[in-house]
Amino acid sequence: LAMSEAEVADCCGYEEERFDESRMAEETANLLGRTFYRCVITPEEYFEIVPYVMYNMEQPLGDASAIVFAIGCKATAEHTKICYSGEGADEFFGGYNMYRNAERYGENLKDFYVGNTNIMKEDEKQKILKHYDPDVLPIEVAAPIYEEMEGLDPLSKMSNVDIQIWLEGDIYLNVDKMSEAAGLEIRMPLTDKRIFDIASRMPSKYKVNEEQNKVAFRTAAAKVLPEEIAFRKKLGFIVPIRIWMADDRYNQDVREKFRSEMAAKFFDVDAIHAIFDDYVGGNSDNWRKVWTI
């Protein structure tokens, strides 16, 4: 935004302050002299649009932020048909907090790391799936990537796995499908091949250190933005769904689907309902499993 000629900025936010970054986005837009639009997403709106998202996605996608992105696309399309988005910066320049553990993981990466949102262990999948296939393993998908990256440092391996699996298989899919459904064209300047070439040649020490992630990127941003914005701690594209889905006002549809005939074709319904009950009972870590199912 700071480097572009865009005159308008759009952002999604929530009433729950600890999940909301839209006020900081508004401050940044005001600082840059841009018109700012804020879309406040309610739990009712979130769950209501899920069928629309799944229909237009044309395949299952267990990414809770895809729903938020769809709402954002629809809101943005009300006043423009072309916009910029910042996808790619985290994967190219070391933006994810887990990248700080890269050196500690070392050579063990290839045995377990298949991306930044691995939801379930294989024994958990085996318990809930009626037709579990032990020959279809996520780590096998990542194996060729690790072969290509042989000899590179651990951070480079992690980021390349995320580029080829997460960025391509989730983020690009989400941007493409949801923008098209809303009649919006999204351009992602940070995924330009020239940007990737710079990032791929950059030593990892300029991407992540013990105190900071996305070091070089933030340092460059500080030339056009105040340091408190450029170096602000990353929250991520988070959704308050872990709170919403535990609320009986919003989770009745989830309960019905977990007991449906369709669910019974693929899952042990008692097993998945046990996961759901455990989540509602206070184990908030299970929310990703519930949403993915």
Name each model feature, range by range:
Residues 1-10, 83-92, 187, 221:
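A phosphate-binding catalytic loop at a beta-strand-loop-alpha-helix junction
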Residues 10-16, 36-40, 62, 205, ...:
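Acyl-group handling in specialized metabolite and lipid biosynthesis
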Residues 15-17, 44, 89-91, 98-99, ...:
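Short, solvent-exposed loop/turn segments at secondary-structure junctions
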Residues 15-56, 131-146:
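A conserved beta-strand->alpha-helix junction
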Residues 58-65:
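Short, flexible loop segments at the rims of nucleotide/cofactor-binding pockets, characterized by
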Residues 65, 78, 82-84, 111-293:
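Adenosyl-5′-phosphate
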Residues 92-117:
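A mobile, often basic/glycine-rich helix-loop segment
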